[in-house]
């Protein structure tokens, strides 16, 4: 179509074109929501240390099954497992995603979301995915701050809230080493001085190491955990794509856990082939590093399951060339038979598309003894599985330092009977009293789970 030079008709033409583009986007989103395949095996069959892995089911239109975000109405809350109770520790937050407990019991929360990206919404697929994420509650601007919450009277509810740090760049992971607080922004590992009991830090963060970012920054969250001696930081960095469709050169130092020297910022790959590792935790008995990983999409509701695994130095876990060890992903070209041959299967599978994000080992005494050494996991919930999976907090029992048994639901009810998401759990931590704290980025709440003594 050729536009005229008259001002008014041109504006009308542009407005008309935008209406058409919007209609096309709505139609594409509706088609995605109504089409796609469904799971062929029960979710339970794809969980554990010997999961069923059906054949890939690639479809022209990927499966989309969104739980629209609506938040919690007054007086409502998630449902705690028998023997537990839950209440709001803090509400009215701005997209709280990650948590860190300080030695004095104060709780840090990263109020954050994805940074703006030049390529957001480009093309029909990009526009549709942007629409999907907004509907799922992930479309809010980033507050770019870390807030401090304090329960001064010990009643299980935060009675003081302060902005500890602001002006950050999509912060996520936090780790305290002596008097230094490390923050993982979406593009850099930063550090600020910390004084015990401080409620505000005005010192400008100092750069420790630049992290993979760039114009795509597909998986933007960066988590960080310190070694026991404080000499090294371990940073979880997700991939820049689903299965390297942006080119393998865009994946440098991504889909990996990086090891950073605390004194000079020197950095190296600790382990690779982990599509989107998020939660990081040291096992309290063995001292091994563990992570939860979000696996790849668009080969069906049954594949590929997210997982929990110990992380070995120098190990390769398959992405993008294979999954669950040496199951080759035929979409990736050129293939790498040498890397596939070395790929390690994860220790424990959590289920397809559950979006496992939070990870915390229990090493306290409020909960019964059988929870000691086991893992609590925040499952943010699927957007591309029929039926949905995740949207809950689970506990994975451990024995002798390894997962042992089927996951137990600890906190459910995040999706209502109409299929709407009242909340979505993300980060999980154990507070100084031994209660479990859960960040809910759709409900804008931090939930506190306690055990009721008999």
Regions found by a protein language model. Give the residues of each.
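Short loop/turn segments immediately following the C-termini of beta-strands
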Residues: 112, 186-188, 194, 238-240, ...
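Surface loop/turn motifs at the tips and blade-to-blade linkers of beta-strand repeat domains
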Residues: 90-92, 163-168, 208-216, 270-273, ...
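C-terminal motif of bacterial Sec signal peptides marking the signal peptidase cleavage site
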Residues: 32-34
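Beta-propeller domain segments
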Residues: 36-81, 118-119, 126-137, 141, ...
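Asp-box/WD-like beta-propeller blade repeats and closely related beta-sheet repeat scaffolds
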Residues: 160-179, 185-227
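Conserved beta-propeller blade signature
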Residues: 106-108, 180-183, 232-236, 288-292, ...
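Blade-level signature of beta-propeller repeat domains, shared across WD40, Kelch, NHL, RCC1
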Residues: 429-454
């Amino acid at each position: 179509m050729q536009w005229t030079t008259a001002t008014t008709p041109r504006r009308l033409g542009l407005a008309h074109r935008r209406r058409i583009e919007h209609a096309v986007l709505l139609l594409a989103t509706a088609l995605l929501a109504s089409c796609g395949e469904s799971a062929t095996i029960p979710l339970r069959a794809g969980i554990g240390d010997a999961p069923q892995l059906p054949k890939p089911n690639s479809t022209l239109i990927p499966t989309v099954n969104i739980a629209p975000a609506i938040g919690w109405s007054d007086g409502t809350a998630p449902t705690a497992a028998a023997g537990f109770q839950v209440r709001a520790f803090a509400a009215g937050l701005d997209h709280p995603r990650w948590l860190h407990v300080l030695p004095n019991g104060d709780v840090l929360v990263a109020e954050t979301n994805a940074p703006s990206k030049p390529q957001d919404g480009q093309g029909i697929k990009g526009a549709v995915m942007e629409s999907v994420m907004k509907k799922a509650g992930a479309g809010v601007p980033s507050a770019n701050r870390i807030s401090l919450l304090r329960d001064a009277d010990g009643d299980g509810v935060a009675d003081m809230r302060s902005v500890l740090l602001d002006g950050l760049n999509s912060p996520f992971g936090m780790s305290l080493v002596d008097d230094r607080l490390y923050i993982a922004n979406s593009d850099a590992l930063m550090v600020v001085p910390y004084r015990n009991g401080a409620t505000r830090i005005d010192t400008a963060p100092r750069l420790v190491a630049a992290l993979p970012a760039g114009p795509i920054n597909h998986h933007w969250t960066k988590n960080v955990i310190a070694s026991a001696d404080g000499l090294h930081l371990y940073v979880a960095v997700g991939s820049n794509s689903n299965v390297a469709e942006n080119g393998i050169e865009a994946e440098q130092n991504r889909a990996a856990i990086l090891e950073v020297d605390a004194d000079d910022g020197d950095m190296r790959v600790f382990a690779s082939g982990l599509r989107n590792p998020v939660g990081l935790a040291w096992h309290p008995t063995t001292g091994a590093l563990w992570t939860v990983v979000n696996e790849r999409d668009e080969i069906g509701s049954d594949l590929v399951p997210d997982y929990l695994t110990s992380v070995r130095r120098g190990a390769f876990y398959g992405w993008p060339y294979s999954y669950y060890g040496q199951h080759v992903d035929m979409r990736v070209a050129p293939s790498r038979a040498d890397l596939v041959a070395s790929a390690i299967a994860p220790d424990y599978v959590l289920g397809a598309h559950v979006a496992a994000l939070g990870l915390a080992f229990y090493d306290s005494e409020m909960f019964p003894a059988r929870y000691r050494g086991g893992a609590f996991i925040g499952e943010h919930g699927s957007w591309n599985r029929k039926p949905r999976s995740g949207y809950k907090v689970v506990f994975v029992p451990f024995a002798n330092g390894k997962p042992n048994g089927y996951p137990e639901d600890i906190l459910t009810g995040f999706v209502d009977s109409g299929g709407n998401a009242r909340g979505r759990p993300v980060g999980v931590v154990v507070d100084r009293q031994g209660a479990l704290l859960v960040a809910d980025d759709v409900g804008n709440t931090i939930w506190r789970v306690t055990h009721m003594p008999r």
